[in-house]
UniProtKB/Swiss-Prot annotation:
Comment on pH dependence: Optimum pH is 5.5.
Residues annotated as binding Zn(2+) 3: D184, D227
Catalytic residues identified in the record: C138, H276, N300
Any one GO molecular function term: aminopeptidase activity
Gene label: Ctsl
Sequence positions that bind Zn(2+) 7: D275
Annotated binding of Zn(2+) 1, by residue: E122
Membrane topology: Peripheral membrane protein
Identification of the protein by name: Procathepsin L
UniProt PTM comment: During export along the endocytic pathway, pro-CTSL undergoes several proteolytic cleavages to generate the CTSL single-chain and two-chain mature forms, composed of a heavy chain linked to a light chain by disulfide bonds. Autocleavage; produces the single-chain CTSL after cleavage of the propeptide. The cleavage can be intermolecular.
Site features described as Cleavage, chain residue numbers: F106, Q107, E108, L112, K113, I114
Organism: Mus musculus (Mouse)
Chain residues that bind Zn(2+) 5: D250, H253
Disruption phenotype: Enlarged thyroid follicles, reduced extension of the thyroid epithelium and increased levels of Tg/thyroglobulin in the thyroid follicles. Lysosomes are enlarged and CTSB/cathepsin B is mis-localized to the apical membrane of thyroid epithelial cells. Serum levels of thyroid hormone thyroxine (T4) are reduced. The phenotype is more severe in CTSK/cathepsin K and CTSL double knockout mice. Mutants possess reduced levels of Met-enkephalin in brain. Mice show impaired CD4(+) T cell selection.
């Protein structure tokens, strides 16, 4: 082959392989990298920026539709911006739904007027939003948050509990640390172990480790757990009368990855395919009509910069949207 022709072919191949970036995004890209402390090699930077730009365009399109009234929630760029949705799901969604020993069944209270809105944060039984990092330990944060609330309601003291204790020590009950687990398995571990350490004594590391539980630092315990029937009405009664509740949801969608504010409704959200454990801390409605714009108030474990300072409102009474009522439970504290 002619040398000049060969060079031309090679140059053409290189040009086709190199992503073309939207220069109008350059300032935002560099600011995003600085904010989230991203350092890449040359080849990885090209790949990550291409992903970031694709996500940014998706967010802009959605928010344009939101402004026109086509959606009830907005989206924004966040720390997950350089991740594909597949990467995102593999890293942070660690709920592993499977058959397991059931707890006691929730007995719905009779002849009780249920309030139209509840927010357990106002009662002082919810700790600040935490961040699970790149570890599939959502189940541990959901379980610890639920037990934190029950212990507060019993003792009047709000103590942050150790997720790392659960990540490292509950393998015998069926959990797999950063590779996923179940809140009910965590409650079972706490019962069998005789306690759970405080966050202060056993801090979170966002990685698997050997069990370092020390009984002298245990500040919480449970005697089992209660499973709630798979209906939103029963879940509403449990939230109103029991406290924050551990729930699982379908968190697999880009719309949730970049959720910002408003009432989340994703047409493709499943009520059965659950992959993320969260903490349900209340419910309510937007506007003046309590029969419209209803939502569940959910505490996530992706840090306070995600969503509404770490929280999300999910559509309520819309056919168990995203599955919040499918696998709800709470620990029993005597």
């Amino acid at each position: 082959m002619n040398l000049l022709l060969l060079l031309a072919v090679l140059c053409l191949g290189t040009a086709l392989a190199t992503p073309k970036f939207d220069q109008t995004f350059s300032a935002e890209w560099h600011q995003w990298k600085s904010t989230h402390r991203r350092l890449y090699g040359t080849n990885e930077e090209e790949w990550r920026r291409a992903i970031w730009e694709k996500n940014m365009r998706m967010i802009q399109l959605h928010n344009g539709e939101y402004s026109n009234g086509q959606h009830g929630f907005s989206m924004e760029m966040n720390a997950f911006g350089d991740m594909t949705n597949e990467e995102f799901r593999q890293v942070v969604n660690g709920y592993r739904h499977q058959k397991h020993k059931k707890g006691r069944l929730f007995q719905e209270p009779l002849m009780l007027k249920i309030p139209k809105s509840v927010d357990w944060r106002e009662k002082g039984c919810v700790t600040p939003v935490k961040n699970q990092g790149q570890c599939g330990s959502c189940w541990a944060f959901s379980a610890s948050g639920c037990l934190e609330g029950q212990m507060f309601l019993k003792t009047g003291k709000l103590i942050s509990l150790s997720e790392q204790n659960l990540v490292d020590c509950s393998h015998a009950q069926g959990n797999q640390g950063c590779n996923g687990g179940l809140m009910d398995f965590a409650f079972q571990y706490i019962k069998e172990n005789g306690g759970l350490d405080s966050e202060e004594s056993y801090p979170y590391e966002a990685k698997d480790g050997s069990c370092k539980y020390r009984a002298e630092f245990a500040v919480a315990n449970d005697t089992g757990f209660v499973d709630i029937p798979q209906q939103e009405k029963a879940l509403m009664k449990a939230v109103a009368t029991v406290g924050p509740i551990s729930v699982a949801m379908d968190a697999s969608h880009p719309s949730l990855q970049f959720y910002s504010s408003g009432i989340y409704y994703e047409p493709n959200c499943s009520s059965k395919n659950l992959d993320h454990g969260v903490l349900l801390v209340g419910y309510g409605y937007e506007g003046t009509d309590s029969n419209k714009n209803k939502y569940w108030l959910v505490k996530n474990s992706w840090g306070s910069e995600w969503g509404m300072e770490g929280y999300i409102k999910i559509a309520k009474d819309r056919d168990n949207h995203c599955g919040l009522a499918t696998a709800a439970s709470y620990p029993v504290v005597n």
